């Protein structure tokens, strides 16, 4: 685990190592959830296995919690901090276009990074907006970002998905969906015949 002082200065990383970057601790309830999302020793071992099995994964972090408003809050923060992130990317000569959708990470607690994903090393990471750079720089260097969930999060996600799909289980929605599928297939066949 790299400490805050090392992260504040920026640092070179060994290509064969995996590093744990703790995010700045938030206050209040958010700080509680950030602390809860720190990986356990079992999760760290599983992350090392994942990095070994998937050589193009450069950044791994906890999934966004399924609490009401988490996704909206993340999107709001991204919009607020996006200009600063774009300026830092420009200063690092990293021409990545940014859109309205926030990167998949960071979501809290920490980020696990593969040293090889950062051949130029890590830039100074002091503020919350600095940590948006980590998955973006990995992407620029050809590496993907991935999230991990606990067993409880995975079960909760299945429950939420099941509830969302329940409305589509009636006869009416199924026939509407079938009708759209047939209509689109006929339209494509008609266009290809021209």
Give each language-model segment a name.
Residues 1-194:
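ER/Golgi luminal nucleotide-sugar-dependent glycosyltransferases, focusing on the catalytic module
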């Amino acid at each position: 685990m790299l400490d805050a002082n090392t992260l504040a200065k920026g640092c070179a990383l060994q290509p064969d190592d995996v590093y744990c970057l703790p995010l700045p601790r938030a206050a209040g309830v958010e700080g509680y959830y950030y602390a809860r999302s720190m990986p356990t020793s079992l999760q760290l071992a599983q992350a090392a296995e994942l990095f070994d099995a998937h050589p193009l994964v450069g950044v791994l972090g906890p999934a966004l919690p399924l609490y009401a408003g988490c996704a909206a809050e993340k999107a709001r923060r991204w919009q607020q901090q996006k200009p600063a992130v774009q300026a830092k990317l420009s200063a690092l000569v990293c021409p990545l276009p940014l859109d309205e959708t926030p990167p998949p990470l960071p979501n809290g607690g920490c980020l696990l990074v593969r040293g090889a994903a950062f051949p130029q090393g890590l830039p100074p990471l002091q503020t919350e907006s600095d940590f948006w750079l980590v998955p973006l720089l990995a992407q620029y260097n050809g590496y993907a970002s991935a999230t991990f969930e606990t067993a409880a999060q995975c079960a909760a996600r299945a429950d939420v998905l099941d509830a969302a799909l329940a409305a589509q289980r009636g006869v009416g929605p199924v026939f509407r969906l079938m009708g759209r599928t047939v209509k689109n297939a006929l339209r494509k066949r008609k266009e290809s015949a021209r």
